[in-house]
């Protein structure tokens, strides 16, 4: 078993007693930090940053050098899997990620294969090992993947989308093709996350960034169903340690009970749901992660502390809460405001963990 200097994050995910509410931030290693931008400039491109374990390690550790965060998260991108499937990931200036060969033809879809994480994604597992060594058991390391549906959105659309015309057309006109994409992708995500766990990830998170774009019935059939398949095949222990998992569907507040039924350890919440109401609905059967609106970090330290305090008070006394943003931190966030949030959560949360 691994002895961590700070295991508060892991204990909170497992709903065990903690002395304060742990905090980390989605995209905590990112463009709001000047040191990140310097490293990215040295790397030459975002993909080079992701695919070089030395750079990925450096960037992963940068926010921990600034802030008293309770977890590190692997620096990578959710689109590594479709890139390894041969879709040709690239980043256009000012346009975000794009694929050279989006999935539109049945022949291409039927020929999809599950990439071997030990070969096609070796740079990711190498980075996990390197980061674990550099962390030296200071705090736990989170591994992650996009959900099958979210990955499929990019794979079919060929880029980010606001209306999801291509994938929703496929969903209703050729659901068999979309199910095939999702089935292969679910196998790929399972293998990928298990490889991260074997390399040293101490918790894993599935980002379902676009599941909230679906109708109620479509979410159950095309998103949650395949996350359930991943959880069924996911390692829950490694080298004697529990490996907790987090499911995060942006816009998923309608479906908390269904997500909880998946058997996940924790549910990530965006900022559109009251965390106290989410706790009542889930009846302390899962941990909850979230859920400050990232835009709060554009305000003052006083407002940040007050808004963080509202979330802590809404969750209330007891364990099972990991504080986070409701989505990724903006590149325009002043770093000192991220510091104000972390300090406020640590200071204000102690009262909720005392008898």
From Swiss-Prot:
Compartments in which it is found: Cytoplasm
Pathway note: Porphyrin-containing compound metabolism; protoporphyrin-IX biosynthesis; coproporphyrinogen-III from 5-aminolevulinate: step 4/4
Q: What does this protein do?
A: Catalyzes the decarboxylation of four acetate groups of uroporphyrinogen-III to yield coproporphyrinogen-III.
Please name the GO terms of the biological process aspect recorded for this protein, alphabetically: protoporphyrinogen IX biosynthetic process from glutamate
Q: Which CDD domains match?
A: URO-D (cd00717)
**Residues of the site described as Transition state stabilizer:** 77
Q: Which reaction does it catalyse?
A: uroporphyrinogen III + 4 H(+) = coproporphyrinogen III + 4 CO2
Instruction: Tell me the keywords, alphabetical order.
Output: Cytoplasm, Decarboxylase, Lyase, Porphyrin biosynthesis
* Assembly: Homodimer.
| GO CC annotation | cytosol
Main localization (coarse): cytoplasm
Question: What EC designation does it have?
Answer: 4.1.1.37
Task: Provide any one GO MF term from the record.
Answer: uroporphyrinogen decarboxylase activity
HAMAP family in UniProt: URO_D
Protein name as annotated: Uroporphyrinogen decarboxylase
Query: Which family does the record assign?
Result: Belongs to the uroporphyrinogen decarboxylase family.
Q: What class of enzyme is it?
A: lyase
Q: Which domain of life is it from?
A: Bacteria
Cite the binding residues for substrate. Answer: 27-31, 46, 77, 154, 209, 327
